[in-house]
């Protein structure tokens, strides 16, 4: 990461994708990255940094200084919230409820005469 950002201007928006969160979300369950402090130190000089991760199967957002973190929900199976139980074991849901708990969405569009625009929305 240090080499990747070394030549960039500090006003360059940075987006980092990682599987495990770059902050200590819940270390007892392995929901954090051991070298996160070092990785984030390379990004301190940038005005806008967004870190996106999975692993925790939870929608979660927080901001620390110039860095905004977003954890995405699951596309496989739901996990309990941090600390609910001794370990992050898959939750059992009633029949027919699994699809509602997953981060699977269908997106459709109709071809028109204008370029398709993407609209950013805040994660809830």
Language-model segments: which ranges?
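His/acidic metal-ligating clusters that form di-metal
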Residues: 1-68
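Binuclear metal-dependent phosphoesterase catalytic core
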Residues: 60-124
